Regions:
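Long extracytoplasmic/lumenal interhelical loops at the membrane interface
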Residues: 245-301
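Hydrophobic transmembrane helix bundles of membrane-integrated enzymes that assemble
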Residues: 2-29, 36-244, 265, 285-368
Length: 369
């Protein structure tokens, strides 16, 4: 017991132990899933315990509480979201350095593509990890020219941003983290597509930083983020009124507003969420998928948690608008693209959101959530 305590006092060893436990729990043959599933639910909590016991990291329950709530609600509603806690742990480790958070994300994007593309193309990943994954089934990035081009643009913009921002160095456990995340997020083509857009926008911001004062647009960016979230629900509620402008917008969005209105008419918005099946369909085998990430989030986690997260999100963006409007831009992009993409606000699919949110929660000295 004393040996174990001495081991976990070292932050790097504690992180390594957690990665080993997580990997063991993840790489299990499908026939053993019913046996291993309870273990997979416990593993992230073991990770939090290991990190919490390290003397170099100080966290409080109020700081961890939002992520634990998201994790719990996700488990209850069938969301496999062990990655939430993994990202929380990474956020804790890099809580004092915002550059480290973004450095981790951009290195992750780069290595994610470099590592997973050839493995998926050769069929190695498909045969050993996740059989039903859409991206891997089609050869992932290397099969379709547009996906390969997207991967190439992502790599180049990521590296250029790292170079311009002088974020080219990363500790060894940071590389370990992104390698593990690459394995956990093999099937998240949507996440990579969104990160590409974020990379391009950040690249532009880096280039024009000397010529444009983003502080002048901080208030607009801050108001635009909650306004985007509110607009999604407003359009859903107004759709049955047969307003010409909303009907045209619904056609432009391939009927997504109509699907949201149908879901609201049939199910309202549950207080504690619904079990969303594969493909984000409410009814298995029937296409009534909620293609809006904002609307989907309220169904997956429930109205109560959505209001809580929305309030936290709004407070965070207000704080950022006063200190660093640079970071509001990718958050706004996520919200806007979240109107038509169904998983962009799901923390499992997008490490950018949880890292940015965590960074500002933890950088508030003495503040509670």
């Amino acid at each position: 017991m004393n040996i174990m305590i001495n081991l976990i006092k070292n932050k790097k060893i504690a992180i390594s132990l957690y990665y080993v436990i997580a990997m063991i729990s993840f790489f299990v043959p499908r026939q053993f899933v019913p046996i291993i599933y309870p273990i997979r639910l416990i593993v992230p909590l073991i990770g939090i315990l290991l990190i919490a016991l390290t003397p170099t990291v100080t966290i409080r329950f109020t700081q961890v509480f939002p992520f634990l709530i998201l994790y719990t609600f996700g488990v209850l509603n069938g969301v496999k979201n062990e990655e939430i806690v993994m990202l929380l742990i990474l956020a804790i480790l890099f809580k004092d350095d915002l550059n480290q958070l973004f450095k981790l994300n951009f290195w992750f994007i780069f290595l994610y593509i470099i590592i997973t593309s050839p493995l998926a193309t050769c069929g190695i990943i498909h045969n050993t990890v996740i059989e039903e994954t859409r991206g891997i089934r089609h050869g992932f990035f290397f099969t379709h020219p547009n996906q390969f081009g997207l991967a190439l643009v992502t790599c180049l913009t990521s590296l250029f941003y790292l170079y311009k921002a002088k974020l080219t160095k990363l500790p060894w456990y940071g590389f370990a983290a992104i390698l593990i995340l690459s394995i956990f997020l093999l099937n998240n083509y949507v996440m990579t597509r969104t990160n590409t857009l974020i990379c391009i926008i950040l690249l532009v911001l880096v280039l024009i930083d000397k010529f444009v004062d983003l502080n002048r647009f901080a208030k607009f960016l801050y108001l635009a983020i909650p306004a985007t979230i509110f607009l999604v629900f407003l359009l859903t509620f107004l759709y049955p009124l047969d307003i010409v402008l909303i009907n045209k917008l619904n056609e432009a969005l391939s009927g997504r507003i109509g699907l949201q209105a149908m879901a609201f008419e049939n199910y309202s918005i549950p207080l504690f969420g619904l079990n969303m099946h594969f493909g984000n369909n409410i009814r298995p085998g029937v296409y009534d998928a909620l293609d809006s990430a904002i609307y989907n989030f309220s169904y997956t986690y429930g109205l109560i948690l959505f209001v809580y997260v929305f309030t936290l999100f709004t407070k965070m963006t207000k704080k950022v608008s006063q200190s660093n409007p640079f970071i509001l831009v990718p958050i706004l992009v996520l919200c806007l693209t979240g109107i038509t993409e169904n998983v962009l606000l799901n923390f499992v699919y997008n490490p950018v959101i949880i890292l940015v949110c965590a960074s500002f929660i933890f950088k508030s000295k003495g503040a509670t959530v």
